[in-house]
């Protein structure tokens, strides 16, 4: 069942509006439910998990709480295990417009983000090329908490899940900075 989630490259993310935890559903372009995401009840140092329809965790993202800048550590699967560590999403310390990037475990810059975090309209770049676009307009959504993610169809499954996690954390950042 996670195959549906892993192979998808066009997503619609729908956040549950009335929820004590950050949670929502992940749909494909045909509006078929293919996964879920959710955080914890206590928001400090939150941990988010993307799960397939069998509730199997595909990706875990842990918010780093003792840090000068916002940062999130990404792990494959459901545990915060060093052997499954994929990298970290960081935010530039001082910037008029928030600036984010993703580094692998060796601190190599893998993805950069360009756009407006406050409207959730931005592009994710890898080696200078656009590999994903995030926008409410992609899905003609006027509902708060609904947005589309369109990825390059040639992206590998691991990169696609990383980008999905990055998008969820950018949404979390946007909500935290309201």
Indicate where each model-derived feature is located.
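Intrinsically disordered, low-complexity proline/glycine-rich segments
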Residues: 1-178
């Amino acid at each position: 069942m996670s195959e549906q989630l892993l192979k998808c490259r066009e997503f619609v993310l729908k956040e549950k509006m009335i929820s004590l935890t950050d949670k929502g559903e992940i749909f494909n372009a045909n509006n078929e439910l293919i996964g879920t995401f959710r955080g914890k009840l206590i928001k400090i140092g939150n941990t988010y998990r993307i799960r397939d329809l069998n509730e199997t965790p595909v990706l875990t993202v842990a918010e780093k709480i003792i840090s000068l800048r916002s940062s999130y550590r990404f792990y494959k699967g459901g545990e915060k295990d060093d052997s499954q560590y994929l990298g970290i999403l960081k935010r530039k310390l001082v910037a008029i417009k928030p600036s984010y990037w993703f580094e692998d475990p060796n601190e190599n810059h893998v993805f950069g983000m360009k756009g407006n975090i406050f409207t959730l309209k931005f592009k994710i770049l890898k080696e200078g090329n656009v590999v994903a676009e995030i926008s409410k307009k992609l899905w003609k959504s006027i509902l708060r908490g609904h947005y589309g993610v369109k990825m390059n169809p040639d992206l590998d499954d691991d990169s696609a899940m990383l980008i999905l996690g990055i998008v969820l954390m950018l949404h979390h950042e946007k909500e935290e900075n309201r």
